[in-house]
Amino acid sequence: MKINRVFSSVMALALTTTLAACGNSNDTNKDDNASNKTKEETSTTDEKSSTDINKDEDKGGSDTDKNEGDEEAIKDFENVTDDDTLVIGVDNLGGDFIQGYTNNTNDVKARRFMGIEGNNGFTTHYVDEAGQWHWNPATLEKEPKIVNNEDGSATVEYKLKKDLKWSDGEPITADDYLFGTLLESDSNFNTLTGSINIGADSLVGYNEFKKGTTDEFDGIEKLDDYSFKITIKADELPYFELPQLTVVGPSPMHYIAPNLSLADNGKSLKVKDGYKVTDEDKKDFAESVDNKIEKIKEEFDESYPEEPKEGSDERKEYDEALKEKDDQVKDLEDSKQGDIDPTRLLIDKASLFETEDYRLNPAVVCGPYKFDEYKNNMVKLSLNENYTGNFNGDKATIPHIIIQVINPNIAVDLLENGDIDIWEDEMKGGRIDQMKAAEQAGKIGLGQFERNGFGNITFLTDRGSTKYKEVRQAIAYLLDRNEFVTNYAGGYGVVTNGYYGLSQWMYKERGADLETKLTNYTLNTDKANELLDKTPYKYEKDGKTPWSIDKANEQFKGDVEGFDYYRYDENGNKLVVNQFGGDDSEITTLISNQLPVNAAQVGMEYNVQSGSLQTLLDYYNFPKDDPDYTAFNMGTGFAHPFDPWLHFSSEGPFNKTKVNDKKADEVTEALRRTDPDDKDGYLDKWEEFNEWYNDYLPEIPLYANQYHTGYTNRVKGFDIMTPEWHANDQINAMTLEK
């Protein structure tokens, strides 16, 4: 069972959900971050959620996206399709098949085929193609029973179907639904594994259990082999997306922890009756700990190949990371010392097995497909003969699936040639045009939907010059955002003004009303100048003489070359904004072409630097007190739950923009605490939140685009595509025409 949140660490930068080997619960993911990433966004993580990150950089290429050698690559491509194998092309794979580490979007795709997360596994609830929650009739005998307790908490009772099986034929029982929560909420789990899953923190008794001050987890209870209940904390309620707090999925206890069992009441783990811990168990545990220590040391050495100079900013960061590494290694070494309690040893052994073995080789699952192998940039899956079907009663029939890494530049060519069967979520205008031409020629099928998110410029709002709202607003007035729609999205998109996706149900119901209340930031240097006059940066270099737009106009000759009439504050600090973007990103290029020139005209020095994704994430996730960069080109994708409190409240665990604003605290708290039955009240608060966001501008929305998915003509039944619904969701209704 999983109802978890996650924390950030040096080892993990992205927002992710927790493991539920046959479907996840997403309390960890209170929102975007849950961020869903796309192939044109960064899909290597450490969202760090989705997520992270919930945020990743939007990347792009030229309009044609063809490079030298691509034509030869098309000719040399090895086709692995056959009558029984569906091949899905992706741009990369990471190889993490459980949550808690990286959250590569294509690893997630594989997990969803296997039911490790998503709608195909036997979770207690699922999300349909329209983004609506339902209890899962594939899993449960009847609708869950919810009791509101006198202390404000809520207890949910579940009764499972008795015919559910793991891929190895073992029955799925209540023990499997409680095991994951007990394991990942254990006091040793995070220190031992480095996972960013922190367990079921929305349940009663979590804090005491996580701290190790009690042996029992009060918020869960086993009723019989096929029934159990959970109790949500009073301070978590009300919560508008209540199913997010109550959704539960199973983990294969018999495979991950074969020598453990649940106590009769299901509130703790114990050594299985009749089993004696062996010397081999102790040896295996010690070896697992040693392997973990070695990986921690290797990761540190990779991050810091050279020791920074004393007194440098890099040295401070290095010393902090070194201490964290040494502390973690010490804790791991200590775990091997002395006489270890048998139960403790087996719990720790299971934690390491889940995160070191099962993570890379999920041999037992309960979704429509089971894991065969991951090598040569391909994940190979085979039909799970023990799968009983999804909530609609549909059951997959295609014998094999291959998820194959390909060059995105030639993806559409491979699709036309039949070398791959599916290419999903394309957002580049040039490739979309190519796909449309192929569809019109009868070569492929094509579907499209509005992106559930947007590309943006994200700010640090508590340091540097971007800590002033007027500076952020001025930057918005220095952009021609329509150019991003035209040149990046190829016209397949629109400019947006708030924290929403065009496909969200809230926007569909209230979007027209909301837009009348929001500022539509358009290129307007006069407005930008007025706003900057309200900031401390209203002087010339001497800190006394008022800065003059007339002088700026006299000195500006059409570009920043030779221009040196910038704004300063009274202490002689220049108005400078430094932005970091990806070095292979067309978005970075578009921003570089606009902002430095436009900003100079109003006295702002705007610099755009590019580099690797990892460098961008480091600057964004771990900013210095005096940061090198306070602006970043990123992308946001919405998942479940939609909970801006996580990202913009001063108490939010994923408040990467460093917002500390009373109004933000109020509107985000009010939104999440809306009663689930008060839909109109929620929409009112959603509008109020977006009005705050549009004014405060922790991010500047640049564009929201359309996604296009292509598939070969032999693929049948792929007739539902939405932001919530992809091939890995529709697979149970799909066939291959022979």
Whereabouts are the PLM-identified features?
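Aromatic- and charge-enriched surface segment that lines or borders ligand/interaction sites
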Residues: 142-196, 223, 229-231, 239, ...
